């Protein structure tokens, strides 16, 4: 079946427009539970995550790291199952690991190795031939901005440089999935912005999908299109941030002067939901209704709109609501 449409047939010209194709599931969880002895860490997680960049959020002890380690096959589920790119974590973990690049939260360097030797070694461990691993190591270190320092020993690196070296070793073999565990942890504001820019660049390149594990809401909000919030081993909330941002633009709050029942009735006839208190109105815009329509109705009825605000539910709002449950 063709994935394009043609226009301009009457003029003899053809314009091909690609149709949007949804991404295949990246991570599928089906009743996934993990237990160490009598201690239950993950409790019946069920979700299908398709985003290009997925954020894992939760307070310390929520189960984020356990979930990552389980998806990589380091922990075995006590119940349920999970798939990554369609591969079962119980029986096809080798295939999963071959597709993943992992940037751990904690350092795992050999301090007397140079950065280029370390990244080359990690490339070889990921299956690259030595000559290709060396070439890719240079490329990865240039990409993250460590070209001039690539022959220095890792033990001489600053915290920010070590984070960049960890990113380089995670991408050296060209994985399909990049797992980032607290990538901006301990970075100063300028180094954080640099890291965020690189994560966005990788995401927008569309060659790798990303799972970002962080306790910093701003990092997730800046880089992710889906968020899974964990609390005490359970899924507290799932949010598609793109949909949340679009939904925010449909919620309005007006401060008016001279508003009356006729104005409210006219808005409701457009299919909008309204709630009126004193000189304030809250409404949900119907599909196809724009703010200019509200201004037009106000002008026709001599109603002055003093202030108009869109609702702005931030990720912090979503997270705090999830933690209340």
Q: What function would you assign to each model-found segment?
A:
Residues 178-182:
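Catalytic Walker B motif of ABC-type/P-loop ATPase nucleotide-binding domains
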Residues 59-63:
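Walker A (P-loop) phosphate-binding loop of ABC-type ATPase nucleotide-binding domains
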